[in-house]
Amino acid sequence: MPRLASAVLPLCSQHPGQCGLFPLEKSLDAFAARYRLAEMAEHTLDVQYYIWQDDMSGRLLFSALLAAAKRGVRVRLLLDDNNTPGLDDILRLLDSHPRIEVRLFNPFSFRLLRPLGYITDFSRLNRRMHNKSFTVDGVVTLVGGRNIGDAYFGAGEEPLFSDLDVMAIGPVVEDVADDFARYWYCKSVSPLQQVLDVPEGEMADRIELPASWHNDAMTHRYLRKMESSPFINHLVDGTLPLIWAKTRLLSDDPAKGEGKAKRHSLLPQRLFDIMGSPSERIDIISSYFVPTRAGVAQLLRMVRKGVKIAILTNSLAANDVAVVHAGYARWRKKLLRYGVELYELKPTREQSSTLHDRGITGNSGASLHAKTFSIDGKTVFIGSFNFDPRSTLLNTEMGFVIESETLAQLIDKRFIQSQYDAAWQLRLDRWGRINWVDRHAKKEIILKKEPATSFWKRVMVRLASILPVEWLL
């Protein structure tokens, strides 16, 4: 029996029907979990991501996958092809190992001139696989909002994407493994050999990634910091304080990648069916929030029933996709008029920015990337799903529905902290104009325009909000 299984199964037997969960708020812990679990793998690694960057953390994890394969682990790597430019040579090398297989979701035929693909095959290539999972030996899995890259793990000099994953053991791991297999064998996925020329006959022990990937000072500093983290010590010696709760996986039908999924099978519909009608409160944290007319109507129906709704999303200054902000900005006044609380994450913070990671709601220079919400302080969703039309209708998504007051209280606590420390609260003045209120200072500071943005950026967003492109956002 693999050592991970021998450590996990006795714990699970003490909590029948429940899953052991550890929320990965801190970016360093999120990287450490993936890196160390890859080192601990003995039989299988099933890895599925929307983005895998060719940067320090991406290369370290590529190296960890190759090292696992050299130990005899079967590695299956499933990537969305929209974000693989520049990775073809690395993927070829990995796929040439007999125990590594790489597959691509909705691959591009034109490798060098990818925009041509959108001209000739738009309806297919506009549908992407946004799922994110990392499953080890069939007994431990990580699911959440993070892709693979320095911006998600606080590993480089880029601004941090503040995010949330959850590490899970228990029955839901088998569900994630089965879901991975559904995607692995679906019609939208192609083996790398069908997309690229992959060399054959390589000796497994001769396949090497560049040594320079591990020899620079920044990489050494980051790995030392990881090794000294309390999380790593708890992970290795099996003393992580797990939250035990009933957990359900929700994942889109892979046929969504072909535009053939039934509407009732789409993740948001199933999500709201499972979570039922809130009676008291919903706290939503979403990097991209484009509610649409139908979504706004649904939110307002809940408000009229006495449900308190609070939403935290990126400000225009913090949003890494400014045009998406247009699909949200057009609905702000209506939501505020009906009593929905809106908070927008600041792009910077007053305190020091020295590698200080505040988890879900960010640190200095952070952009919100988490996708989570809690209902009535009892139920939580953590996953890849953004509250926008693209996640609803075009991209495939996944996530966990968790029945845990402990986890819901954690989300609520972080939300409340962000309201005062990391975000502007939006309010309407007596003339119905939006004000941005900074409550971090001793005295409230009221701003009359989109904070920390230029005139031309505001004009661009205003123009984008007029265009009929909401369904693409």
Swiss-Prot record:
EC number per UniProt: 2.7.8.-
Summary of activators and inhibitors of this protein: Full activity requires coexpression with the neighboring gene ymdB.
Keywords: Lipid biosynthesis, Lipid metabolism, Phospholipid biosynthesis, Phospholipid metabolism, Repeat, Transferase
Alphabetical list of PROSITE patterns matching this protein: PLD
Keyword Coiled coil: no
InterPro entries recorded: Cardiolipin_synth_ClsC (IPR030871), PLD-like_dom (IPR025202), PLipase_D/transphosphatidylase (IPR001736)
GO molecular function, one term: phosphatidylglycerol-phosphatidylethanolamine phosphatidyltransferase activity
Active site: H130, K132, D137, H369, K371, D376
SMART domains from the UniProt entry: PLDc
Disrupted gene: phenotype observed: Triple deletion of clsA, clsB and clsC results in a complete lack of cardiolipin, regardless of growth phase or growth conditions.
Domain PLD phosphodiesterase: 125-152, 364-391
Gene Ontology biological process terms from the UniProt entry: cardiolipin biosynthetic process
Entry superkingdom: Bacteria
Top EC class for this record: transferase
Recorded coiled-coil stretches: none
CDD domains: PLDc_ymdC_like_1, PLDc_ymdC_like_2
Reactions performed catalytically: a 1,2-diacyl-sn-glycero-3-phospho-(1'-sn-glycerol) + a 1,2-diacyl-sn-glycero-3-phosphoethanolamine = a cardiolipin + ethanolamine
Misc note: All three cardiolipin synthases (ClsA, ClsB and ClsC) contribute to CL synthesis in stationary phase. Only ClsA contributes to synthesis during logarithmic growth phase.
Biological role stated in the UniProt entry: Catalyzes the synthesis of cardiolipin (CL) (diphosphatidylglycerol) from phosphatidylglycerol (PG) and phosphatidylethanolamine (PE).
Record-stated family: Belongs to the phospholipase D family. Cardiolipin synthase subfamily. ClsC sub-subfamily.
Annotated protein name in UniProt: Cardiolipin synthase C
